Amino acid sequence: MSTNLIVANIKSYETLEEGKSWIEKFLAHKDSFSNLTQKEIIICPPFTLLLSFSSAFLGINIKIGAQNVSPFGEGAYTGEINAKQIKDFAEYVLIGHSERRKNFAETDDMLKKKTEISMNNGLKPIFLVQSKNAIIPQGVEVVAYEPVFAIGSGNPDTPENADEVAGVLKSENEYQVLYGGSVTPENVRNFTSKANINGVLVGGASLDPEEFYKIIENA
């Protein structure tokens, strides 16, 4: 049986105090974490909470990811957070989310740079695509298919279509392919039971640690 990756993208939510509350509620399930076999849990908080989350889950089989990374290395790049800095707190990084492609005009060339600099610094990219025809940089191992219409809409793609897209992506390379877009505790198994889907990327539902834990249990 293959491992399902269950990824939480908390996006630009949660203050320091709210993040502490999230952690406390999620850790209430700590005793049952060992029962989550064949599931790898990755939580991607905002930059301001990377230290809190990485410290809270130290020694527990929960991985931490960042939501973004600078396309530059160390240097005079005011406001940027580079891969070397992120590596102190996280193992994974999200690259290519449609919100960043749209709101920050991130191009395929920029995403390639982000991917390369992440891998060169020991981070594992989770590369997000919106279609089966997306350009995926060399070296990527985990791809998340997130159709734009499904993000935060409550209107997910059909499991059958998501599985078909995942199959096309896998035909190009041996990726682990995740599905993202309006994932809930009620529908998650419809996706993870498909042959070509290796997990889910959870957005809105991950803001509630109880909902996210239910998704993990049901996946």
Predicted regions and their residues:
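Active-site loop-to-helix "anion-binding N-cap" substructures in soluble metabolic enzymes
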Residues: 1-219
